[in-house]
Amino acid sequence: MSTELENVKKQEEEYSASNIQVLEGLEAVRKRPAMYIGDIGEKGLHHLVYEVVDNSIDEALAGYCTDIDVTINEDNSITVRDNGRGIPTDYHEKEGKSALEVVLTVLHAGGKFDKGSYKVSGGLHGVGVSCVNALSTLLIAEIRSRDGKVYRQTYSKGAPTSQVEVIGECSDRGTTITFKPDESIFTLTTEYKYDILANRLRELAFLNKGIRLNLYDKRKDDEGKTREDHFYSEEGLKEFVQYLDATRGTPIIDQIIYLDTERNGVPVEVAMQYNDSFSENVHSYVNNINTIESGTHLTGFRRALTRTLKKYAEDSGMLAKLKFDINGDDFREGLTAVVSVKVQEPQFEGQTKTKLGNDEVSAAVDQAMSAALGHYLEENPKDAKAIVSKVILAATARHAARHAREMVQRKTVLSGAGLPGKLADCSSRDRSIAEIFFVEGDSAGGTAKSGRDRNFQAIMPLRGKILNIEKAQEHRMWENEEIKNMFTALGVTIGTEEDSKALNLEKLRYDKIIIMTDADVDGSHIATLMLTFFFRKMKELIENGHVYIATPPLYLVKKGKQERYCWTEKERDTITAEFGKGAHVQRYKGLGEMNAHQLWETTMNPDTRILRQVNIENAAEADRIFSMLMGDEVPPRREFIEKNAHYANIDA
């Protein structure tokens, strides 16, 4: 037996109660759950699953687990099963109870804090499965142990309701956790969304090549069918970039640039590809956590990319005739990249604690990236020339866009920030209560103007479909009248004291920006164009929770003097049955079919309306979907629409 295999065997045998370290008690979790899982809404609900899956991923990173199954049960409980070593069940001397009970009842207890057990660990909050236990009315832990026995213990709201019991024998090893979230804590929803879990498991499969992640949904849809997906990646980040790039135009280089190395004790993995699109699509991860606020690892990547490409471009003489400087943005136009690092003790900063602060990681990524990219450019001169040509085109377009933008912003200042003529503004200047509706067409705009509360609601009619930002270079955006009017109406500009390219929200005039369109194909297209614009050019508005979609009712059911609005077919059928014989159903195909009073009552009145807040649960997946919906590739768009058509309710 080799020394390496002996060490793995020894470590496997020694993973027991003594490896479990305890940092903190569980008392506070039920009192302040948002402190531990982010929030008690949909995001926090799904975070419970991630905490349990992270334990299994940690086992995989340590080399002991290859398969992880996640099942959404019919009652919206979750079961996570892995084939790792199994949580130890032996007696924990210091705590006076089994190691299993320590892991499940003490916050931050786990082998991941013991450097002898796990080298690195995921888990943004790092609170472990005990937090899941505290926030569940039922948790069942089943351990297939190394002694060939199956151990079981049950819990409720963090407290054990049984002893650790032997319930059978087994020939394999692993952990199975089943939990049911507490409805008294998750008051908004306890219903798991398949797509949110699927996106995260897909992401984890790409980030951890060689691990099989399976998702099963035992809940039946309207046709009596269940769902399942299986995620496995042989090539990891290379396949991740291919997946993200499949909807983003045509690659301009022959192969994906890839590196997987270690610098100064920091494992660094990068995959990148250039295509002919006009936007940057770079995603970064630390220990499998999506660092949406970037951090030192991304700083190192960008610095190395700019410096290495610029040096090659200068040495090749391709920049000799350029009459203006190129900058970092030019080197990243059309770039799709994933940067993943593993850090033993990550320091997270920023508003959402998703910004890496470790200084040593920047140098590690910079060194690794410089060496790999420099070698690639020398070995592949054809690809190198294609990349530099793309950079020069990007610089030329940026120069034209800056000139167009300055003209627009200068004109706005000189004209005293005159608002667009079509804007029916609200009288309040209190941004915290003000809201603006972007409405499809002058007809619906007229109804909305009549129905609104002019004290705090502004109406901005849109003339037809706005520019498709996904396919347009930036200077075209600044030449587009509708988009210029949107910037002016919102009071948003480009450039802050810290960053001349950042979105400036200081003079944002409204707290809520509401997209209100018809429930038909054209209306959905306009809404998607608007969302693409906000996602690509004003992402901070989405991240700060300002963007919403109005949901007008689809039906009005009437019988005599009784009338009820319905937003779904199921609701319509229930009300129709309730009203009985003689009920009349009206289908609303457009906002213009409602009068001002009806539009106010159903869609604009804060007390009765239904607004859907736009948020970015998964930045990489959101980017891919926008590229697919608004890009040039038809087959993936058709496949997406066919797969998701039953979630939509629009008339073709």
Predicted regions and their residues:
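Short adenine-binding "F-helix/F-box" segment of the Bergerat
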Residues: 92-93, 100
